Amino acid sequence: VTLLPRIDRWPNLFVSRTFSKVYGMAALRCGCLFSSERHMSFVRKAQSPYSVNMLAAMAARIAIKDEKFIQDYVLEVLAAREVLYVEFEKLGIPYYESQANFVLFQAGERAIEIRDKLRDRGVLVRDRSYEIPGCVRVTIGTRDQVERFLKELKEIW
């Protein structure tokens, strides 16, 4: 869902896109901003002349053209998220439902331990206890990635 087609209808609308999530290009630190020509002229005045490196710009141009890949990937992530929810329910792990490509689950006092043990097994999650005590954030990727995460989590839970 995007409001990009509405930019001409709503003069104060800005739409931003990140290439970090669905496109899997977080290391390139690339995103883009869309608005009316009038608003973009103000943005350009404040923009750094080299705000995006050439490699990131080229990768973004190529990635944005492959709409089918993105649609397929989003559907796969949605299905994988449901698998994750079902398994969390079976394991009795409290979690927060999400509309994003990540889920927070409650690990209590073991949050840092869980993060570290998963890291030792090659699975990276983020401890979010400083924001929500006891919470761990897991990014949802493909079904294979979610199943790998669940396999490792079950062994240490």
Segments predicted by a language model, with ranges:
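PLP-dependent enzyme catalytic core of the Aspartate aminotransferase-like
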Residues: D116-L124, S129-W157
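Short hydrophobic/aromatic beta-strand micro-patches
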Residues: F34, L104-Q106, T139-G141
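PLP-dependent aminotransferase class I/II
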Residues: N12-F88, I93-Y96
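Conserved PLP phosphate-binding loop immediately N-terminal to the Schiff-base lysine helix
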Residues: V1-L4, Y23
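Short acidic/glycine-enriched loop/turn segments that link adjacent beta-strands
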Residues: A27, Q99-A100, E131-G134
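Conserved PLP-binding catalytic core of the aspartate aminotransferase-like
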Residues: V77-L78, E82, V86-R121
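Nucleotide-activated donor-binding/catalytic signature segment of Leloir-type glycosyltransferases, i.e.
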Residues: P5-L13
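Short, flexible helix/strand-to-coil boundary loops that buttress conserved ligand/catalytic motifs
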Residues: I7, V43-Q47, V74, F88, ...
